[in-house]
Design a protein with these regions (language model features):
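Catalytic-core segments of thiol-dependent peptidases
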Residues: 1-75
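Active-site-proximal C-terminal subdomain of hydrolase catalytic domains
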Residues: 67-165
Length: 165
């Protein structure tokens, strides 16, 4: 990866997938604590279930900057305001992508994959770019927390090169 005028440097990407983790909050807590980008696709459970913010404490989040995408039906109603107070630094360290409408499950994987590809594409994607890439489910998405970001993709030159080793 190369940022601005810095010398290029190596970095690692680790992708964790969980399938069928719909009753226990343990895998979600592990993923939240150990990720810079957390992407969830599944039921919002009407605000209850394993992702209920009441199941989490500030200790379940890293101190680093983090993006969380809660790709479930009307997830904005259940998650947009409750995770932010749990995160050290609030919106300076957490951007939360949520859906205002129902998100059809049959296109969710495609939308999540396109979001991730745009994020890791090697350029400097803005949230507009990321949301346009993930529009397959057209769930009226919103990003909370981006207004006070220090990093601005339009002001930084980041280049990611993927090599096979």
């Amino acid at each position: 990866m190369k940022v601005g005028n810095e010398s290029p440097r190596d970095f690692a990407i680790q992708i964790l997938f969980y399938f069928g983790a719909d009753s226990s909050s343990a895998p979600h807590k592990f993923a939240t604590k150990n990720s810079d980008v957390f992407i969830y696709n599944g039921h919002s459970s009407i605000g209850y279930g394993p992702l209920d913010p009441r199941n989490f404490t500030s200790a379940d989040f890293p101190s680093s900057y983090q993006i969380m995408w809660m790709d479930g039906c009307a997830s904005y109603n259940y998650y947009h305001k409750d995770y932010i107070p749990l995160k050290e630094g609030g919106t300076k360290n957490l951007d939360l992508v949520t859906n205002g409408l129902e998100a059809p499950a049959w296109r969710g994987g495609t939308a999540n994959g396109k979001f991730l590809v745009a994020l890791l594409s090697g350029g400097t994607s803005s949230y507009k770019d990321l949301l346009l890439a993930a529009r397959d489910t057209e769930a009226m998405r919103v990003v909370d927390g981006e207004l006070d970001n220090v990093y601005k993709p339009t002001k930084a030159s980041t280049r990611v090169t993927i090599t096979n080793r």
